[in-house]
């Protein structure tokens, strides 16, 4: 699925000179609603393309699995968000930069859709800013 999403956004990635690293294991199969799973990864990808900037990289990896869950990390090396926004990123209609979002046509729903789709699969999602300039969202 992730390979298909990256193929769908190839033009946007090239225009913004974004490098995408799909580090998911070949043949990884996740049980769940395929439309919602697609929505999760597509919205995270679209969000990174729209707001992270140019000349960045996006990395998607499965960093752990157990008998119930896969644990994914979706990160980019873009402009990031301030720590004051982290607790609200997944709220409906929340925008970090209202002017920029309006100009780019964002609705403020993408990450809320992601959160709800993750919850419907019994998981959680959160974002954090590590010591280096990378924005991470984790979901399981």
Describe the function of each predicted region.
Residues 11, 79-80:
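Glycine-rich G1-box
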Residues 81-93:
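Short conserved segment of the HATPase_c
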Residues 54, 122-123, 133:
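Conserved glycine-rich
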Residues 48-49:
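Short helix-loop "hinge" at the ATP-lid/N-box region of the Bergerat-fold HATPase_c
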Residues 14, 19-28, 65:
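Conserved catalytic submotifs in the C-terminal HATPase_c
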Residues 76:
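Acidic ATP/Mg2+-coordinating residue in the GHKL
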Residues 55-68:
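Short beta-strand/loop element within the Bergerat-fold HATPase_c
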């Amino acid at each position: 699925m992730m390979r298909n999403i990256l193929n769908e956004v190839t033009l946007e990635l090239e225009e913004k000179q974004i490098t995408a690293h799909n580090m998911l294991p070949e043949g990884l199969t996740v049980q769940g609603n395929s439309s919602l799973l697609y929505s999760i990864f597509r919205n995270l990808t679209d969000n990174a393309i729209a707001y992270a900037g140019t000349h960045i990289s996006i990395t998607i990896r499965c960093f752990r699995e157990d008998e119930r869950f896969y644990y994914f990390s979706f990160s980019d090396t873009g402009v990031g968000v301030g720590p004051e926004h982290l607790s609200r990123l997944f709220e409906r209609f929340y925008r970090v930069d209202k002017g920029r979002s309006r100009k780019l046509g964002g609705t403020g729903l993408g990450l809320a859709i992601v959160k709800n789709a993750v919850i419907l699969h019994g998981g959680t999602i959160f974002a954090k800013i590590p010591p280096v300039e990378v924005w991470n969202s984790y979901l399981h």
